[in-house]
């Protein structure tokens, strides 16, 4: 059995700047029998924050074959001030335990993209979701 994860994001979108602020992530996880609930929730929380960082902040650009960002002053992963409220529900199960390593990472970006569409009608389809991308989608 694979690990199943669902995610819903609550966002605010600034229509002028295109900035997206994630207020809350809610994740529901079915990973079979959970042996250590606190550890499982911590793993899901960390993975969801990694997914959030990749969805909104992380992305490498290259100029003339060289990386544009060579240090953390210009390459901006998720910062503590951008961490939203996170709610995690672990589904009860009698199935064998399965991995929690990365599954929660993959559902965050689609949840944010759908939340942006629900909030303002802008459909974004590329990562990372930058303010310029949201502004462009709003104009479309």
Name each model-derived stretch.
Residues 1-140:
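C-terminal catalytic domains of large/alpha subunits in multi-subunit enzymes
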């Amino acid at each position: 059995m694979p690990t199943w994860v669902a995610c819903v994001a609550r966002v605010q979108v600034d229509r002028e700047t295109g900035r997206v602020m994630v207020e809350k992530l809610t994740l529901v996880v079915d990973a079979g029998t959970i042996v250590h609930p606190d550890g499982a929730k911590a793993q899901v929380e960390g993975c969801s924050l990694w997914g959030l960082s990749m969805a909104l902040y992380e992305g490498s650009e290259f100029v003339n074959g060289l990386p544009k960002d060579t240090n953390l002053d210009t390459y901006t992963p998720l910062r503590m001030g951008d961490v939203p409220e996170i709610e995690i529900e672990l589904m009860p199960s009698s199935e064998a335990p399965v991995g929690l390593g990365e599954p929660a990472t993959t559902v965050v970006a689609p949840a944010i993209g759908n939340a942006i569409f629900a909030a303002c009608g802008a459909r974004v389809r590329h990562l990372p979701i930058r303010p310029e991308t949201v502004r462009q989608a709003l104009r479309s």
